[in-house]
Amino acid sequence: SILKYVLDCKQYEGKDTSRFTLLDPMSGSGTSKAAADRFQVRSLLYDLNPAPAFGRGNWNALRDDVEDSADLIFFHPPYHTMIAYSGNVWGNAPHPDDLSHCASYEEFLDKLNYCIRKFFLALRKDGRLAVLVGDIRMNGRFYSMQNDLMRMGDFESFLVKGQFNCTSDTRRYRKPFIPIVTEYLLLLKKADALLVPFSVRQTGAFSVADTDLNILTWHHLIRMTMESAGGTLTLSELYLRLGTHPKAQANPHYEARIRATIYEHPEEYVFVARGCYQLSYQVA
């Protein structure tokens, strides 16, 4: 277990573990307490549920302060809306700050990252934040929490954990389907008392239609331009579509370059009629 690993590291380095503390801010059924009891260490359990199995209830991760400090914080958040907790597992109505009731994945991720920042700052020097997350498939889209969440401190380890007895195990799907059968544990170490390195995933988009890159060849520019038109274009149409592209602007003989590229790749461009070509494969 992660608890054993962290304890072993401290003992190997000759550090005192008599006041070792495990904190679980979303403790659920209280599994963390059982682990702490097994290794005879102090445990602190919080949960939004007003009446949790163990520990302090009615604790709001988005609004309440972490009044304690810990050597290991085990954070197992909801997986967005896969399982609704308040108003379903406990309570009679959804709680507005329950991460399992976020209106969008973006809102969920913002709140998840807020929790990660808060919990990491509650670590003692040399402490670890263990974050257990999974993947989500929702409304035809795939979301990977471990890929999207922010990292703080030193990224010490990444563990893959198998999931068993999943709902998808017994379902039949009309479309090809890759089941989600794993969870991931990210172990983040607080190596310095004050300095906190971090990384946040950034996303963006660019259009090849008006962007030049060192890795973009004429062949792939022409091929993708033809894909965008359904797979067939005349040379005149290619000249028109690509004439304003940065590659063409930098090459006064771009029309000749387009013709030469098509000639150099007969396995990709098929002659249809005079001055007209189509891709050798069907465009999706």
Where are the regions that the model predicts?
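Class I S-adenosyl-L-methionine-dependent methyltransferase catalytic core
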Residues: S1-E264, F271-A284
